[in-house]
Amino acid sequence: MSLIPSIFGGPRSNVFDPFSLDMWDPFKDFHVPTSSVSAENSAFVNTRVDWKETQEAHVLKADIPGLKKEEVKVQIEDDRVLQISGERNVEKEDKNDTWHRVDRSSGKFMRRFRLPENAKVEQVKACMENGVLTVTIPKEEVKKSDVKPIEISG
């Protein structure tokens, strides 16, 4: 996965990355007035995910502060598509309360990643600690090819 932001929509999407299924938003850079609610929710809706590959596994880490593990779903779709989704509900308002500021976001999020052929999708594990979701996908062992030297005659 490229660490350089895409020219088509910043770091959240990269049209050249075969593993990313995030959609390019052609209207993202247009400055069209939107509701203040959608702008405030964008930090939650556009959940950032880091993906690294080690010798043994693919490891994805998502910052999802304020959610319980019961509010987050991790699933494999269509054999090789990892989907991370969740929802934070709006806090109930008491009509007698006076709000001075509302910065915490609410809403739904969903991120999808196409897993490579060497991923053991039947052994995926997920854990959540301190608002960070970690998904570990073990890799198939790379078969070492048998090398047989051929003598050159002549």
Swiss-Prot record:
Alphabetic keyword roster: Cytoplasm, Stress response
GO molecular-function terms, A-Z: unfolded protein binding
GO biological process, one term: protein folding
Domain of life according to the entry: Eukaryota
Subcellular location: Cytoplasm
Keyword presence, Cytoplasm: yes
Database matches in InterPro entries: A-crystallin/Hsp20_dom, HSP20-like_chaperone, Small_HSP
Domain (sHSP): residue spans on this chain: 40-154
SUPFAM superfamilies for the chain: HSP20-like chaperones (SSF49764)
GO cellular component term of the entry, any: cytoplasm
Assembly: Forms oligomeric structures.
Similarity field: Belongs to the small heat shock protein (HSP20) family.
Protein name in the entry: 17.6 kDa class I heat shock protein
The species this protein was found in: Glycine max (Soybean)
Originating gene: HSP17.6-L
